[in-house]
From Swiss-Prot:
UniProt modified residues of type N6-acetyllysine: K58, K84, K444, K459, K490, K586
GO molecular function, one term: ATP binding
Gene (name only): HSP90AA1
Domain free text: The TPR repeat-binding motif mediates interaction with TPR repeat-containing proteins like the co-chaperone STUB1.
Region (Interaction with NR1D1): 629-732
Protein name: Heat shock protein HSP 90-alpha
Chain spans, region Required for homodimerization: 683-733
Modified residues (Phosphothreonine): T5, T7
Residues carrying S-nitrosocysteine: C599
Segments for region (Interaction with FLCN and FNIP1): 285-733
InterPro entries: HATPase_C_sf (IPR036890), Heat_shock_protein_90_CS (IPR019805), HSP90_C (IPR037196), Hsp90_fam (IPR001404), Hsp90_N (IPR020575), Ribosomal_Su5_D2-typ_SF (IPR020568)
Length: 733
């Protein structure tokens, strides 16, 4: 109990006022609320409406077992009454009210808040004095008010008034004002600079934002003026108008009825009446408007809600001009209770992955009270495009972001939301046309999910769609790919790159296409990250056709032929490795090439050419990682290609043939380009090509017309062997 500091002994005719000191924690709490939890002042109205809603919940709950509890007031509602003359905002509810003890305890000490806690206590046989606990939200009233008066009436006690100017103490007295019946009236005496909260527009804005889904009607009472047409005499003075009206009525009553046929006297009066001028005056009246007519759609049975209703709610929630693409409406009951209504928009926002921008996608409610709309813990980043509401029965109303991070309840809600989202996507996938629209907009999110969410990776992988070497213009799922696999095919083959045409024409897919093996085309940068985590699908390993050790289905005869080719070109491989030195890790005979002379592949755990390109484009890249991930390049040569065969013969005929070195380097650099890599020194490569062009055109390298810079570079280049231009070109060929 707070310490009672002073009791005034007054004559019996005057009401007794008791003064109490706030507990020390209250002063600290108020400072904490103002400086930490509630930086935006408008939150006070949400908290007070929420408290009213709690009080209404409690009386409604009690009336279930004892209907007579509502005899003191059948209607359950909340009224908001701004008064500009007195600079007060009053919040009135017909809830359970508070006894004197409740007032002293609940508005003088830190009290718990929440309907559920109260109901559990009541079921456990707790004393009735435990009710009406306002919680910390009440003190947020002092963000805008210099003084707060609370008048309350409980069924089991008299009407009392609590008052405090936040000066470390509060007073409690018996209230002799207008009887309330039952409920609580909170009167905020606003600070001079907070009068915006008396404006009709501002109050409506706050209620719509924070409390539009409270389960009881919230009515705003506003004093307004309207024009009323009266005669001049009436306009001059109200009393005269009344007297004149009475006199006219009396005169008309005194007239004999026989004169109703239209005497001269009546006509005169009519003319005089017509001559009287009419004038408009301002008349004051009280306008009542219910602010939360939209009842929470998520609390209704999904079977009773039409798609049009979902559409209207979605548009009001998101301000989107288009209808939603899909919707999931569900509730979870048991140890944990919450309802959720989730929408998939038709298109992704342009700033979907803009991390610095705060998201406003899923609104968190606690028992129909809006808590926050940027709750990162509620849904993983890869599902940040999902719009909707989550309404929990178990979270405390005064929860902060810091508390949310530790909340076990929220972790369970998050798990359920992800599960339901994946169910929704799977249902959507059954409609090919709609899923195509969805995938065009949100495929990156699915792939990001595969990279980040190991728990749901399998389900997410079923949602992937790709172009393949056999799919034409249709995108297919990995499941579709698996159904078309060859009998002896053990792996799922894929290639990453920039465009569909680029990967389709790549040297890496030549032999696979020739053998009728389907190759998946992964042409988005995020595919590289996705496939790093997606190692297998339905027991089949995903294999990149651009990496070393590619295993293709082959019979014994093919294996034997391949071994013979390896032996035949072993020497050339060694010579080429010596020439290229550290540029490549090794040179081997390829089993994947058909029409290309050579290609560059990467080690199993290194980056592909496409990944190297992506990483080089990163502004904040780690150069040390670039060093060891990008260096593992292997040169594969095609033993069936005429260039490689001729080069082998030339190298074996004369190991010291200088043109071999030039040709090997040229082959390597060209293979780098065709395999998707970039050149470290493009100018040197260009100069080699220019020399080939000169030879082709029969231009003498020593031609004095050649510019100095070209000549200087040419001197540095290893010369091509031969005495004349003809022999040189033959070597190149």
């Amino acid at each position: 109990m707070p310490e009672e500091t002073h009791t005034q002994d007054q004559p019996m005719e005057e009401e007794e006022v008791e003064t109490f000191a706030f507990q020390a924690e209250i002063a600290q709490l108020m400072s904490l609320i103002i400086n930490t939890f509630y930086s935006n002042k408008e939150i006070f109205l949400r908290e007070l409406i929420s408290n009213s809603s709690d009080a209404l919940d409690k009386i409604r709950y009690e009336s279930l077992t004892d209907p007579s509890k509502l005899d003191s007031g059948k209607e359950l509602h909340i009224n908001l009454i701004p008064n500009k003359q007195d600079r007060t905002l009053t919040i009135v509810d017909t809830g359970i009210g508070m006894t004197k003890a409740d007032l002293i305890n609940n508005l003088g000490t830190i009290a718990k808040s929440g309907t559920k806690a109260f109901m559990e206590a009541l079921q456990a046989g707790a004393d009735i004095s435990m009710i009406g606990q306002f919680g910390v939200g009440f003190y947020s009233a002092y963000l805008v008010a210099e003084k707060v008066t609370v008048i309350t009436k409980h069924n089991d006690d008299e009407q009392y008034a609590w008052e405090s100017s936040a000066g470390g103490s509060f007073t409690v007295r018996t209230d002799t004002g207008e009887p309330m019946g039952r409920g609580t009236k909170v009167i905020l005496h606003l600070k001079e600079d907070q009068t915006e909260y008396l404006e009709e527009r501002r109050i409506k804005e706050i209620v719509k934002k924070h409390s539009q889904f409270i389960g009881y009607p919230i009515t705003l009472f506003v004093e307004k003026e309207r024009d009323k047409e009266v005669s001049d005499d009436e306009a001059e003075e109200k009393e005269d108008k009344e007297e004149e009206k009475e006199k006219e009525e009396k005169e008309s009553d005194d007239k004999p009825e026989i004169e109703d046929v239209g005497s001269d006297e009546e006509e005169e009066e009519k003319k005089d009446g017509d001559k009287k001028k009419k004038k408009k005056i301002k008349e004051k009246y009280i306008d009542q408007e219910e602010l939360n007519k939209t009842k929470p759609i998520w609390t209704r049975n999904p079977d009773d809600i039409t798609n049009e209703e979902y559409g209207e709610f979605y548009k009001s929630l998101t301000n989107d001009w288009e209808d939603h693409l899909a919707v999931k409406h569900f509730s979870v009951e048991g140890q944990l209770e919450f309802r959720a209504l989730l929408f998939v928009p038709r298109r992704a926002p342009f700033d979907l992955f803009e991390n610095r921008k705060k998201k406003n996608n899923i609104k968190l409610y606690v028992r129909r009270v809006f808590i926050m709309d940027n709750c990162e813990e509620l849904i993983p980043e890869y599902l940040n495009f999902i719009r909707g509401v989550v309404d929990s029965e178990d979270l405390p109303l005064n929860i902060s972001r810091e508390m949310l991070q530790q909340s076990k309840i929220l972790k369970v809600i998050r798990k359920n939301l992800v599960k339901k989202c994946l169910e929704l996507f799977t249902e959507l996938a059954e409609d090919k046309e709609n899923y195509k629209k969805f995938y065009e907009q949100f495929s990156k999110n699915i792939k990001l999910g595969i990279h980040e969410d190991s728990q749901n990776r399998k389900k997410l992988s079923e949602l992937l769609r790709y172009y393949t070497s056999a799919s034409g213009d249709e995108m297919v799922s990995l499941k579709d790919y698996c159904t078309r696999m060859k009998e002896n095919q053990k792996h799922i083959y894929y290639i990453t790159g920039e465009t569909k045409d680029q990967v389709a024409n790549s040297a890496f897919v030549e032999r696979l296409r020739k053998h009728g093996l389907e190759v998946i085309y992964m042409i988005e940068p995020i595919d590289e990250y996705c496939v790093q985590q997606l190692k297998e699908f339905e027991g089949k390993t995903l294999v990149s056709v651009t990496k070393e050790g590619l295993e293709l289905p082959e019979d014994e005869e093919e294996k034997k032929k391949q071994e013979e080719k390896k032996t035949k070109f072993e020497n050339l491989c060694k010579i080429m490795k010596d020439i290229l030195e550290k540029k490549v890790e090794k040179v081997v005979v390829s089993n994947r090439l058909v029409t290309s002379p050579c290609c560059i592949v990467t080690s199993t755990y290194g980056w592909t050419a496409n990944m190297e390109r992506i990483m080089k484009a990163q502004a904040l890249r780690d150069n040390s990682t670039m060093g060891y991930m990008a260096a593992k390049k292997h040169l594969e040569i095609n033993p069936d290609h005429s260039i490689i065969e001729t080069l082998r013969q030339k190298a074996e005929a004369d190991k010291n043939d200088k043109s071999v070195k030039d040709l090997v380097i040229l082959l390597y650099e060209t293979a780098l380009l065709s395999s998707g890599f970039s050149l470290e020194d493009p100018q040197t490569h260009a100069n080699r090509i220019y020399r080939m062009i000169k030879l082709g055109l029969g231009i003498d390298e020593d031609d004095p017309t050649a510019d100095d810079s070209s000549a200087a570079v040419t001197e540095e280049m290893p010369p091509l062997e031969g005495d004349d231009d003809t022999s040189r070109m033959e070597e190149v060929d």
